[in-house]
UniProtKB/Swiss-Prot annotation:
It is found in: Cytoplasm. Pathway: Cell wall biogenesis; peptidoglycan biosynthesis. This is UDP-N-acetylmuramate--L-alanine ligase. Transmembrane segments: none annotated. Keywords: ATP-binding, Cell cycle, Cell division, Cell shape, Cell wall biogenesis/degradation, Cytoplasm, Ligase, Nucleotide-binding, Peptidoglycan synthesis. GO terms for molecular function: ATP binding; UDP-N-acetylmuramate-L-alanine ligase activity. ATP binds at G110, T111, H112, G113, K114, T115, T116. InterPro entries: Mur-like_cat_sf (IPR036565), Mur_ligase_C (IPR004101), Mur_ligase_C_dom_sf (IPR036615), Mur_ligase_cen (IPR013221), Mur_ligase_N (IPR000713), MurCDEF_pg_biosynth (IPR050061), UDP-N-AcMur_Ala_ligase_MurC (IPR005758). Belongs to the MurCDEF family. GO terms for biological process: cell division; cell wall organization; peptidoglycan biosynthetic process; regulation of cell shape.
Length: 451
């Protein structure tokens, strides 16, 4: 890739990964972001020039400009590049270009779990095939990075359905974890339009194998809608109707055990990640690797080394009011993700009381899922609800934090982190486990606990 490429919004997790991948594939790379952070520091350490002010950037020196969704079309650097006739590519469009440098690409998509599933498959393939690479939307703990380029054989990518940008991609393998109602403004608030976009994605000529979780209603709807016979379509899940059925799920000493029935064989596995949903995610990756020709024993040995992705059920021990307390930091921000996480906490800590500290993310999500929130937020033993993280949205009347728990009782409304800590200091002890959850800045609460 002998090109000069400028990445706008390079301080984000997705664009930073593309910048590193492009550099390792031979491109001359520079980046711009309005704020320096850990990711821009990492890029500078790799020899990538980072601009914090647009004033020092000579756009005319570049062949391609890649931009994140956070960069407005009116941004001066993007406007200048377009006026000069320089090729300008949205993040997913450039990922599609990068994919052409690899022999075989595997894309993971779905409303929930795609980052975790991508990290599982990336961890497996990097152990099973030293020439495998990955570009995902989170820090894979096994590699302590969101990107690794080990060659140009296999590439694992996360395909984003939230803005329909997965339609730019042309992989050979597609894993769909689930199809649910989120980011519905992208699909004109139409479930049928959402399904049609997923159908268009898996119908691409490049796609040869499709793996879907049949436990999910959205995936079942897609299977009913999809009728092409020229592709290898495999369903997986706990359902007896799955082509590859999961069974005998149980926890021993905080290790998840399960079996799958694959082409007549009963195969057993162990996994460090918690919950039925992560067993579903892992199964998709296992059968993908089996179909690629890797041996069961090698996959089994690699799977137990999978530690997932940052901010997905991260475990900490904190001292709170003199008590050692297990604290879990999790990115979940949708009712389905909340319910799955609380179920996983119950499975792993059956004798402990769950205190759920939740920070809603986006007023539009509160509004669109207003009927689903009360059930999900009632599942813990104690809910502490924080103000909604706006993500730059304007407040929507009737869609604030207190509105998503209408009909519930016993919850505690915290006006900020200090208030939440006050509640935790009153409630937490050795017999409790604290789940701190949300896609905003609530992870900072984990850091300041017991300081």
């Amino acid at each position: 890739m002998n090109k000069k490429i400028l990445f706008l919004g390079v301080g984000g997790i997705g664009v930073s990964a593309l910048a590193i991948a492009a550099k390792r594939l031979g491109a001359h790379v520079a980046g711009y972001d309005s704020v320096a952070n850990k990711l821009t520091a990492k890029l500078e350490a790799l020899g990538i020039v980072i601009f914090i002010s647009p004033n020092g950037v000579d756009v005319a020196n570049f062949d391609i400009v890649v931009y994140s969704s956070a960069i407005l079309s009116s941004h001066p650097l993007l406007s200048q590049a377009r006026s000069l006739g320089i090729q300008c590519l949205q993040r997913a469009m450039f990922l599609a270009v990068l994919m052409k440098d690899f022999s075989y690409s595997l894309a993971i998509t779905g409303t929930h779990g795609k980052t975790t599933t991508s990290s599982v498959l990336a961890t497996l393939l990097c152990q099973l095939d030293k020439y495998s690479s990955f570009i995902v939307g989170g820090v894979v703990k096994y590699a302590d990075s969101n990107i690794q380029v080990n060659g140009t054989d296999k590439l694992v990518i996360e395909a984003d359905e939230s803005d329909a940008s997965f339609l730019f991609l042309s992989p050979q393998v597609v894993i769909i974890t689930n199809i649910d109602l989120d980011h519905m403004a992208t699909y004109n608030n139409s479930y049928q339009t959402l399904l049609e976009n997923f159908t268009d994605f898996v119908s691409k000529e490049s796609v040869k194998s499709i793996y879907l979780c049949v436990d999910d209603q959205g995936c079942r709807d897609l299977l009913a809608k999809y009728n092409q016979s020229d592709k290898n379509v495999t369903s997986y899940g706990f359902s007896i109707n799955a082509d590859v059925q999961i069974y005998d799920y149980h926890i021993i000493d905080e290790i998840t055990h399960f079996k799958i029935r694959y082409k007549g064989d009963d195969l057993s596995f162990k996994l460090q990640l918690p919950g039925r949903y992560n067993v579903q995610n892992a199964t998709a990756c296992i059968i993908t690797c089996l179909d690629l020709g890797f041996k069961y024993e090698d996959i089994r040995n690699a799977l137990i080394k999978v530690t997932g992705v940052a901010r997905r059920f991260d475990l900490y021990t904190k001292v709170i009011s003199g008590h050692q307390v297990t604290v879990i930091d999790d990115y979940g921000h949708h009712p389905v993700e909340v319910a799955n996480s609380i179920s996983a906490v119950r499975d792993r800590y059956p004798n402990k009381k769950i205190i759920h500290v939740f920070q809603p993310h986006r007023y539009t999500r509160n509004r669109d899922l207003i009927k689903d929130w009360p059930k999900a937020l009632s599942l813990a033993d104690q809910l502490i609800l924080l103000p909604t993280y706006s993500a730059d949205e304007q407040i929507i009347k009737g869609a604030e934090s207190q509105d998503i728990v209408k009909g519930l009782s016993g919850y505690l409304l915290a006006d900020g982190f200090d208030h939440a800590i006050y509640f935790l200091e009153k409630l937490a002890n050795e017999n409790t486990v604290i789940l701190i959850q949300g896609a905003g800045d609530v992870t900072n609460l984990v850091e300041i606990l017991s300081e």
